UniProtKB/Swiss-Prot annotation:
Gene coding for it: glmS
SIS domain segment(s): 284-423, 456-594
Main location per the UniProt record: cytoplasm
Protein task: Catalyzes the first step in hexosamine metabolism, converting fructose-6P into glucosamine-6P using glutamine as a nitrogen source.
Record has Repeat as a keyword: yes
Native organism: Streptococcus mutans serotype c (strain ATCC 700610 / UA159)
Uppermost EC category: transferase
Protein name: Glutamine--fructose-6-phosphate aminotransferase [isomerizing]
Amino acid sequence: MCGIVGVVGNRNATDILMQGLEKLEYRGYDSAGIYVINQPENGRLIKSVGRIADLRAKIGIDVAGSTGIGHTRWATHGQATEENAHPHASATGRLVLVHNGVIENYLQIKENYLAGHNLKGETDTEIAVHLIGQFVTDGLSVLESFKKALHIIEGSYAFALIDSQNPDIIYVAKNKSPLLIGLGEGYNMVCSDAMAMIRETNQFMEIHDKELVVLTKDTAQVSDYDGNPVERQAYTAELDLSDIGKGTYPYYMLKEIDEQPTVMRKLISTYANENGKLTVDPAIVKSVQEADRIYILAAGTSYNAGFASKSMIETLTDTPVELGIASEWGYNMPLLSKKPMFILLSQSGETADSRQVLVKANAMGVPSLTITNVPGSTLSREATYTMLLHAGPEIAVASTKAYTAQIAALAFLSKAVGEANGKKEALEFDLVHELSIVAQSIEASLSEREVIEKKVANLLATSRNAFYIGRGNDYYVAMEASLKLKEISYIQCEGFAAGELKHGTISLIEEGTPVLALISSSETVAAHTRGNIQEVAARGANVLTVVEEGLNKEEDDVVVNQVHPYLSSISMVIPTQLIAYYASLQRGLDVDKPRNLAKAVTVE
């Protein structure tokens, strides 16, 4: 949520800031702004509500400089107005600050330190920059004022600060909110994630919590809040411009849906050698082996991926699996088993709720595994172990390829653990071969997109609500399918276990209600689901069926190629991703940037 970009050095700051903010749009925002300066006390501060294009329209050709900071804001404290948009200036206008996160004690700071200050907006960020500015007015240097403020401020934050009297420096600090340094020749950058800087550099440096960076065009000096130097090595990001472009696609979401066969094959090459032998880190395998219960913690789509994998993990490892919503566990962790193992699923690796659980797990000495798409992310750094999805950047807010990659990664982990345990089911499960078949199944489903588009036009284009139903793993896919549909089409959609219809939900079925039914698994389960279809059809529902090959009938709408039952959640979800995409498209909505949503939820 929100995004920061900053640059100091021999670059056109305005161009870099605007390009960076455009690359951060996927994180979600409702306003944006930049501050650019070239000579002391000659900066320009420009803000707007709405899209980055609205901000660009306000920027004249005379707005230039070699140092600048920019920000996309998602309203938390205060409404989406220009007054509340970032950057914010201190009382004298000397200091300018951008901030991501939530300052928990901002009201106490206002009461204790800022009596008499005329605040223009309603944000916690403005209070932070006024606090730093007050210490400068009291006689401290900007650096010492920044340090003093950091010792007072509580909560999550990523800060980038410019002193207009000395514009060759950007002061940076973070706690519980993502921030990276980008390193160039004669210039340096700061940003919320690497994608916003990849046009300028692929050399990055991590900032850990409660660290401060003094950034100039030639140096990035890292220290703790007391001024003690910290050594930090740079790393090279495995990104290039083609990874973050749409190419010929109208939307990132469609591109990312189409990339899923490639992602499956990439995971095969990552976690298995040329002979098909798995190469999952033995230390991870041993840690899972030693657990008497696996706890999967996640949010949103990642939570659904965990549910879709639960039965497979239990069957292959012979270890019970419990799912937890990270935002609930952070405040209400249940009684754990004697030898727990936490697995945290997060596409971004920055999910604040999951991080709160991880902090508690670390404090209790519980081993943890992060499965994420972003190397160097907070969860990957702080967990005991990490497995990467290698899915490439996922920019559309609605997650698609990360969901299927998470299930595949959990399959590799489960088979590796099961093999180590001598479990028959794991030894007989040829995952490399079966996942190759899944990749082919996905390609077959993608080739049917025109059929799906027409079905959606007839069923969902004008609907206000809809239901997904399924049994077994199809129920878990229904949960993800309903989330995807509501996220980007704004159709009120819920996923239900088909057998629960008669226990309340069927009362909502009326003439014309769309019901989308998922059928895979066994003939017995399929027969029961078809019975539920008859029940809703008898009450006027318009039904669309997605059925696995071998269980299909002539009247079914979408047929999915048959795959191994352990992996059916991957193949069955593909048509539902396309259904959501076309429903959003046909309703004239922005598929990649649904309202009120952010890609990475970095505040609780």
